[in-house]
Regions:
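Short Gly/Thr/Asp-enriched flexible loops that form oxyanion-binding sites at enzyme active sites
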Residues: 7, 11, 58-65, 215-234
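Phosphate-binding and adjacent anionic-ligand microenvironments
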Residues: 200, 204-206, 228-230, 248-350
């Protein structure tokens, strides 16, 4: 729709009128790519206009700082105080697009940013050759929940070698009203109604769904014994990804001696056992992935630990440090890599 884009561009022009250089994507992009781009472009901050995994009436802001992480205290309070200080919107400076372009304040981000983002994800792939050997035999159903994941998820699956990818047609194209979804959240079983129907039609091995801003991943896998599709909680899928990644890194000699595993305090204690198994420092943080992303900056500033993996039970994890927020696209890559490294076994079996 025009309205959300117009509202976003209005904010852009206000920043430019205050002499702030702005980079804007030419079309919708996933939240983790925004986090990535903030650091790539050496920006002071980043803004994502999104309803995230909520109904459209909750459309709002996610704000990132120069490290690519969502803001935490005290910046969050300071920003809100500045917003409250505006009593008359007529006092807000604005500028037209042409003048902003001439002054070098309005900049469209090129498609090379997409390439750089995908390249960063692929660096986390551990068994590319093995995966390609079995990829032809795997059927994947995917839904972007009418959001931003459609293009990058299909691209990463294609570049990994997966050809049998079936996208839920009713939820493929961007739809700011989420017409087919009461609640576009991978945690909600009702959100998988269309995906499950398609999976049964094509006899899919696995179902993947990303929330509209593509930072949360939901997974269903076919039980080879019953033929039914079973869902995985955020704890389950997070631990499967963690075990796969850490075991493969250990086997290949890629684990850091001072590695750290970060989780939120409400997430499963199984993470403690996995961290111990791989001799990693377990760090617990408050609920919210921004506190996991914050730890990466602490590690770098203080030269203490190397980030190995982070997750929260609400269907979010981060593999690598290319972004500083949860990333469903890299989680898709890790999930299919884990599941199909064993060729004809499924996550339900494991």
């Amino acid at each position: 729709r025009d309205q959300p884009r117009s509202r976003g561009l209005g904010d852009v022009y206000k920043r430019q009128a205050n002499g702030i250089k702005v980079y804007i994507f030419p079309s919708l992009r996933p939240t983790p790519e925004l986090s990535f781009a903030v650091r790539e472009l050496h920006c002071t901050a980043g803004i994502m206009v999104t309803a995230s995994h909520n109904p459209p009436e909750y459309n709002g802001y996610k704000v990132y700082w120069d490290d690519g992480c969502q803001i935490t205290a005290p910046k969050d309070t300071q920003i809100i105080n500045e917003v409250k200080a505006v009593t008359d919107f007529n006092d807000v400076k604005t500028i037209d697009e042409e003048e902003a372009r001439v002054r070098g304040l309005y900049n469209i981000i090129g498609y090379d940013m997409d390439d750089a983002f995908i390249a960063a994800l692929k660096k986390q792939s551990l068994n590319g050759d093995i995966i390609k050997q079995v990829a032809d035999d795997i059927k994947i159903v995917y839904s972007p929940f009418n959001g931003t994941g459609n293009v990058p998820v299909r691209r990463i699956l294609r570049e990994l070698g997966f050809k049998n990818v079936y996208v839920v047609p009713e939820q493929e194209k961007p739809d700011p009203n989420f017409t087919t979804l009461e609640y576009p959240n991978p945690e909600d079983p009702k959100a998988f109604t269309y995906a499950l129907r398609l999976a049964k039609e094509v006899d899919a091995d696995i179902i993947l769904a990303t929330d509209p801003d593509a930072d949360r991943l939901g997974v269903y896998s076919k039980d080879t014994k019953s033929g039914e599709y079973k869902s995985f909680t955020g704890n389950m899928s997070g631990m499967l990804i963690a075990e796969y990644l850490l075991s493969q890194r250990k086997e290949k000699g890629l684990l850091h001696e001072n590695g750290a595993f970060v989780k939120t305090i409400v997430s499963t204690n199984l993470a403690d056992l996995i961290a111990k198994e791989y001799n990693l420092k377990l760090i617990e943080v408050l609920t919210g992935f921004k506190y996991i992303g914050e730890q990466i900056k602490f590690f770098e500033q203080n030269n203490t630990y190397e980030y190995e993996f982070g997750f929260e039970e609400s269907y979010g994890c981060l593999v690598g440090t290319h972004a500083r927020d949860k990333d469903a696209i890299v989680a898709v890559m890790a999930s299919v890599s884990y599941t199909h490294l064993r060729a004809h076994e499924t996550e339900a079996d494991l």
